[in-house]
């Protein structure tokens, strides 16, 4: 009995702390914390996301499909596309590799991740080339099955993934 009594404390010994904490929480709860994993945006702001990562109705076929990337536009024609991190180009402009991507670039990064940049109107790098973060790698376009000029941007933990589980949401790496 005496042992239990030593651990009994008032439920809220400092109610002012709870009020203060709640006020700060309410003030900042909607603040978007930027994701920082060493990656930068692949196109310049202002960026509009036109199709999110995940299940969607295909704008081409009308069927349900898993969209393995994120579609980005910024309203400017011939928008430059930049490498999101340092790495080595493993695919450059090979429209026949995966015909639904049109002209595209894939970069392997030091952390083992791969980034893909699809539907490019122009590819400015070549296979085997080393690139640095923010280096221009091409121009946004609408090659391959596409409903308009945009960048299909994707993260993968292997090339080329055997299942959807190996694709990652770009928003987990970069704040858009």
Q: PLM features: what roles do these ranges have?
A:
Residues 64-68, 83-124, 146-157:
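Zn2+-dependent peptidoglycan hydrolase active-site motif and core
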Residues 35-39, 48, 76, 126-135, ...:
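Acidic, glycine-rich catalytic/binding loops that coordinate metals and/or anionic ligands
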Residues 80-92, 125-140:
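Short, well-structured beta-strand-loop connectors
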Residues 1-9, 73, 113, 122:
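Peptidoglycan-targeting cell-wall enzymes and recognition modules
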């Amino acid at each position: 009995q005496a042992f239990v009594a030593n651990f009994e404390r008032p439920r809220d010994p400092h109610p002012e702390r709870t009020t203060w904490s709640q006020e700060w929480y309410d003030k900042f709860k909607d603040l978007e914390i930027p994701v920082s994993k060493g990656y930068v945006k692949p196109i310049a702001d202002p960026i509009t996301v036109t199709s999110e990562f995940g299940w969607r109705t295909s704008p081409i076929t009308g069927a349900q499909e898993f969209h393995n990337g994120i579609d980005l536009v910024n309203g400017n024609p011939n928008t430059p596309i930049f490498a999101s991190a340092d790495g080595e180009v493993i695919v450059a402009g090979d429209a026949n590799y995966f015909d639904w991507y049109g002209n595209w670039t894939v970069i392997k990064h030091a952390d083992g991740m791969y980034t893909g940049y699809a539907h490019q109107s122009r590819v400015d790098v070549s296979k085997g080339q080393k690139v640095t973060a923010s280096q221009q790698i091409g121009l946004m376009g609408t090659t391959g099955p596409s409903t308009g000029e945009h960048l299909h941007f994707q993260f993968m933990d292997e090339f080329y993934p055997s299942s959807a589980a190996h694709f990652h949401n770009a928003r987990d790496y970069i704040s858009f």
